[in-house]
Swiss-Prot record:
TPR repeats lie at residues 510-544, 563-596, 603-636, 637-670, 671-704, 706-739. The keyword Cytoplasm applies. Required for the maintenance of the cell wall integrity. This is Essential for maintenance of the cell wall protein 1. PANTHER family: TETRATRICOPEPTIDE REPEAT PROTEIN 27 (PTHR16193:SF0). It is found in: Cytoplasm; Nucleus.
Length: 904
């Protein structure tokens, strides 16, 4: 029953459901406190029980404080056989830390003074040491967080419960074993502990500016497989409803996505989002509908809308009713509060999405396996959604709202910033969450308001509302701000704020304030931005603020002051190195904290040294620094990609192959990585491997990348995969024809395809044609003529295929076009080579008239291909001689024309 109780705690289940089971009521009471947002009561009991029990030997420092905590836990707290008790304590500590730093309002406890028995200045020193203990790879955690003791204790307890090596004792040069979780062999309670440990590690990662270190690797390993959830569900009583297990699995996939977003592996999000969507039976689609956006708009115009409906609602999660965050009306003289959509079924055919998208295959009108399933036409909208009122859609379940938010974050992390179309998609997602009736969860609603405000602050007509909303949301977390726009409310439901905090990406309260400062900075309000950064104690961000406006001297002063105050801040050294372009500062950053960005900066410096340095590119040094960086943080896709590109450039194909192999394992859908991996294999004479990589590349989103298709074509030629060569040729022409015209045609390859095509006899019945013959004929005879403009060589190839098809009239027409293409060359009268080429074309055309003219024509027996072919021969020769008369009379080409005329 312990596993069931903890499963309910993971889900933040209804408190009443705990009382109905045959649970140990002592643990039920603890679970009630945690689920109801009263974790601080368990923490207070813990502090009261062990008051003054932690003693620090010697000077107060990070190492001495961690050593004291370890001794305290080993002697006083952690007892074998009491893992369940310790797990509740670890959860309560984590939840209290999150409440104090992420959701608010803070629970003011005096834990440090109680446990350590310290007062005055010593409390501040212990708090600073605890904050610094949460640093990762030279990146200090935010120093002014509240109660870091709670998170440190929670992490230490969870490490003991799971039996894993403590990450507080690991040096950057060491290697640690990653957790392995099995659905069959891992006990359910241990799986629960792993789950909470991953949550705590993601909390720690959110305290630093950039994800790195062992914490990211361990969290990723825990969330790697759904065995984490299955290890728990296998131990649940048979009487437990299947819906409960489904909710647990759905929550796992949501947190898996959150983890991927947190450690910058967002390309892994889509499979988990797809599984979560299936488990919750969530139906949604993005499509187009006509809408009015202004008060005086007479005609509605097409826009994007998310149609969504929940078919499964959480039956076990805590249902909370609380005041939603303060919202601000737009109060615009022009814009409506929200777009008013007309009926989906009334969308005119010429205003549907596909009419605005070029080259869309209308047979694929519904794209489901995307971050945003897309219906290009009305008939492609799922029937379950087609009847929805776009202005009054039904309430979504909390899990489905979270899915939309997670898809929004994934899109933001994988698309260019400030892209108008992307912003329209994000706005459609947020509108679906915000504009729905029914109860709203505080955290979900507040996060949606925050993301909407970030978009609105980029637009002139909505910037005022956006800034006010951001300021209001910052204040609602109960920050220590002297003057507030919104009065504090005493009716705050902490449980509502905490219920989905582990499924939504973490945003600490100071990060909200820092984002507000970034907005001020983007608007040129430097003073307000600097004031916020200084209030938050973010020296590095303040320096970057000044550097962004060109005041690098001031930025250097701030960073030097920061280094004097905390000489272990590797990030400050690295940023100072970025500003001064000084390799010694990056080396210092790496020396004191193994800060991976310092090594990345060194690699970029030696790859492309600044002109004033006088240095030459040093690829060996670049590879060395990148290798050091990747040893510390092997989850960085960008670093692996750069590593591979450098390997390609300096001819080290083994390194390039290794790097791009890691890239495609991190992001299996990155077409350029597959293409570059194939390039490395090609150089290593591993053509089959290169061919397989290119097949993966073109199966990814590479429809517009002609270089990938060209590489695919060339490797396929070497392997004699002629059907794939043909496919690549067709795709190359399709992609490049608008910009390059007939330059998109690879003539040597086309000639080889034609040679292969005409070696066999043309069958009597068209149905007997093979796939290659049909496809190649269609390409040569239908596609190429639309592209050819001046290439006589191309027209001759088309003529050859037409003759093979037993269409001599079409072949003769191609010969005529070939001659016209070259005879209209303006250089005909000045360059003898052009003159001779034209004479060759004329002779070819005359020969074609002679050989094809008397064949059976297009209209069957009795008709000829060209009845007056002799006349056309003479006319063609005469016309060319008139162009060359007076300039090429004495040339060999002229003599050939005279001879040809005499032989007719």
């Amino acid at each position: 029953m312990e596993t069931l109780l903890h499963a309910k705690l993971l889900l933040s289940a209804e408190v009443e459901s705990l009382k109905s089971g045959s649970f140990d009521q002592t643990y039920v009471k603890k679970a009630e406190h945690i689920i109801s947002g009263e974790s601080y009561q368990l923490v207070q009991q813990f502090v009261d029980k062990f008051k003054g029990k932690i003693s620090i030997s010697g000077e107060i420092s990070t190492s001495s404080v961690i050593a004291a905590l370890n001794d305290f836990l080993n002697v006083e707290v952690f007892k074998m056989g009491q893992e369940n008790e310790m797990l509740f304590l670890a959860i309560a500590l984590l939840q209290t830390f999150i409440q104090n730093n992420y959701t608010g309002p803070a629970a003011r406890l005096k834990a440090i003074s109680g446990l350590f028995g310290k007062t005055g200045i010593e409390i501040g020193a212990v708090n600073t040491a605890l904050s610094r203990s949460l640093a990762i790879m030279g990146q200090p955690a935010y120093e002014f967080m509240d109660d870091p003791l709670y998170l440190v204790l929670s992490l230490l307890l969870l490490e003991r419960i799971t039996g894993q090596k403590s990450l507080f004792d690991v040096t950057p040069d060491q290697e640690i074993p990653l957790p392995i979780i099995s659905a069959e062999s891992t006990p359910g309670l241990l799986a629960v502990a792993y789950w909470w440990w991953a949550r705590a590690l993601l909390t720690q990662l959110s305290l630093i500016p950039e994800p790195s270190g062992f914490q990211a690797s361990v969290a990723s390993a825990i969330y790697q497989s759904a065995d984490l959830a299955y290890a728990i569900t296998k131990e649940l009583p048979e009487s437990i409803h299947e819906d409960f297990k489904r909710e647990l699995c759905a929550m796992y996939y949501l947190e898996n996505v959150k983890c991927s977003l947190a450690i910058n592996t967002e390309h892994l999000c889509l499979p988990s989002l797809t599984r979560a969507k299936k488990i919750t039976n969530f139906e949604f689609v993005m499509t187009g509908a006509r809408a009015t956006r202004t008060k005086y708009q007479q005609k509605a115009h097409a826009g994007l809308i998310i149609l969504a409906k929940s078919f499964t609602f959480q039956n076990f999660a805590l249902r909370t009713t609380s005041a939603t965050p303060e919202t601000f009306a737009l109060e615009s003289d022009l814009l409506l509060e929200k777009p008013h959509f007309e009926s989906i079924a009334d969308e005119p055919l010429d205003e549907q999405i596909y009419s605005k998208r070029q080259k869309v295959d209308l047979n694929e009108g519904y794209e489901e396996d995307k971050l945003l399933p897309l219906a290009l036409r009305q008939e492609n909208i799922p029937k379950l959604l087609l009847d929805l009122n776009p202005n009054d859609q039904p309430t979504l379940s909390d899990y489905d709202n979270i899915q939309l938010l997670l898809r929004l974050y994934t899109i933001k992390n994988t698309t260019p910033a400030k892209d108008p179309l992307v912003e329209e998609e994000l706005t459609a997602l947020l509108s679906r969450i915000l504009y729905q009736n029914g109860d709203k969860n505080w955290s979900i609603f507040a996060r949606s308001l925050w993301e909407r405000s970030i978009i609105e602050t980029t637009k002139a007509k909505t910037i005022e509302r956006g800034l006010l909303q951001m300021q209001s949301l910052v204040e609602e977390l109960d920050l220590k701000i002297k003057s507030k726009l919104v009065p504090s409310s005493s009716e705050i439901n902490v449980a509502s704020r905490l219920s989905y905090i582990h499924q939504l990406p973490f945003i600490p309260r100071w990060q909200l304030d820092a984002t507000l400062a970034e907005k001020y900075m983007s608007l040129g309000i430097l003073k307000s931005a600097v004031e916020i950064y200084e209030r938050l104690g973010m020296a590095c961000e303040t320096a970057l603020c000044y550097a962004a406006v060109g005041d690098e001297k001031k930025a250097e002063e701030i960073l030097l002051q920061r280094i004097n105050e905390n000489d272990s801040d590797a990030r400050a050294y690295s940023i100072l190195g970025d500003i001064k372009q000084d390799p010694s500062l990056w080396e210092k950053s790496w020396e004191i904290g193994k800060y991976v960005n310092a090594k990345n900066s060194l690699a970029k410096y030696y790859f492309n040294p600044p002109p004033k340095s006088g240095a030459q590119p040093n690829y060996s040094a670049t590879l060395k620094h990148l290798n050091d960086s990747l040893r510390q943080y092997p989850l960085s896709f960008e670093t692996w990609y750069f590593y591979g590109c450098v390997g390609l450039q300096c001819g080290k194909m083994q390194i390039a192959a290794e790097a791009f192999t890691r890239c495609v394992s991190l992001d299996p859908y990155h077409a350029l990585s597959w293409s570059n991996l194939s390039a490395a294999y090609t150089k290593m004479d591993k053509l089959k491997e290169a061919y397989s990589c290119l097949k993966r590349a073109i199966s990814c989103d590479a429809q517009k990348n002609w270089k990938i298709w060209e590489n695919y074509m060339l490797v396929a030629v070497k392997l004699n995969e002629w059907e794939d060569v043909l496919t690549a040729c067709k795709q190359l022409v399709s992609i490049r024809r608008d910009k390059s015209g007939e330059g998109s045609i690879d003539l040597p390859i086309i000639e080889k395809l034609v040679e292969l095509l005409v070696t066999s006899e043309y069958p009597e019945e068209p149905q007997q044609l093979s796939y290659f013959q049909k496809s190649c004929t269609e390409f040569i005879c239908n596609t190429l003529p639309q592209v050819i403009t001046t290439s006589a060589r191309c027209w001759r190839l088309v003529a050859r295929v037409e003759l093979w098809r037993k269409r001599p009239w079409a072949a003769l027409e191609c010969h005529e076009k070939a001659y016209r293409a070259i005879s209209h060359n303006p250089d005909l009268e000045v360059e003898e080579k052009v003159w001779n080429d034209t004479v060759d074309a004329c002779e070819d055309l005359v020969a074609a008239y002679e050989s094809l003219g008397e064949m059976e024509g297009k209209y069957g027996p009795g008709s000829l291909v060209c009845k007056d072919w002799k006349y056309k021969c003479r006319s063609t020769i005469k016309a060319l001689m008139s162009k060359g008369k007076g300039r090429w009379d004495d040339s060999p080409g002229w003599d050939r024309l005279v001879e040809a005329r005499s032989q007719i």
